[in-house]
Amino acid sequence: MKEKFDLVKLLNILKKNIKLLLILPAICLVVSTALTFFVMPDKYTASTQILVNMKKSSSDLAFQNVQSSLQSVNTYTEIIKSPRILDKVSREFDGQYSTAELNSFLKVTNQTNSQIITVSVTTGNKSESDKIVNRISKVFAHDMPKIMSVDNVTILSSAHDNAVKVSPIVSVNLVISIIVGIVLAILIIFLKELLDKRIKTEEDVESQLGLPILGSIQKF
């Protein structure tokens, strides 16, 4: 019975503050919309896929060759991000992007037990993301045989005007802003109730003062 009473009391508190519950999420939504469309910069990601195989010798078995390539994938990913590759890419862009900037744009990943490396570049310009990721992949494919014992570096897929917008994600930002607004409104409502020590109901007299109710005066 007490749980039911507490729930009713809780709902009454929320109902009493319904304006705040509606206004604060609306304000957060407007602010988020403004930030998303007018402040937050767009980001575009373009990707390529690269396959690297080790050099074969007459004594190597195909399985051993694949296993060796798999074990070397982590090394290849680090080489792609190394100054040896990125310095050259920076020079080919006539210094438009520094090595540090290129490294900040770059993400290199691979699936477990796969020889395929995915190279991704994220910038604020769709075409530049395409150009940079393609150039990094080409430099890596050209220089890799000189760095390690590989003779077959294949660019499986290049970026051709296929950069994808990755941020800001409008729907996610708007949903989050509404949730934040509701949470803030509820916190403010209950904080206000906790700090309000006024006695407003008969139940408050019994719970806060510990006194029995002898009678009540009706409102006219």
UniProtKB/Swiss-Prot annotation:
GO BP:
capsule polysaccharide biosynthetic process
Q: Could you tell me where this protein is found in the cell?
A: Cell membrane
Q: What InterPro entries does this protein map onto?
A: Bact_polysacc_biosynth/exp (IPR050445), LPS_length_determ_N_term (IPR003856)
Domain of life the protein comes from: Bacteria
The answer to keyword Transmembrane applying to this record is yes
Question: Pathway of this protein?
Answer: Capsule biogenesis; capsule polysaccharide biosynthesis
Q: Which GO terms describe its molecular function?
A: protein tyrosine kinase activity
Q: Where are the transmembrane segments?
A: 20-40, 171-191
Q: Which residues form each disulfide bond in the chain?
A: none
Q: Which Pfam families match?
A: Wzz (PF02706)
Q: Taking the first listed entry, what is the main subcellular location of this protein, grouped into a coarse class?
A: membrane
Kindly list the GO CC terms recorded for this protein: plasma membrane
Keywords associated with the record: Capsule biogenesis/degradation, Cell membrane, Exopolysaccharide synthesis, Membrane, Transmembrane, Transmembrane helix
Topology of the protein relative to the lipid bilayer = Multi-pass membrane protein
Family from the record: Belongs to the CpsC/CapA family.
Reported function: Required for the biosynthesis of type 1 capsular polysaccharide.
Name by which UniProt lists this protein: Capsular polysaccharide biosynthesis protein CapA
Q: What species was this sequence derived from?
A: Staphylococcus aureus (strain Mu50 / ATCC 700699)
Q: What is the lineage of its organism?
A: Bacteria, Bacillati, Bacillota, Bacilli, Bacillales
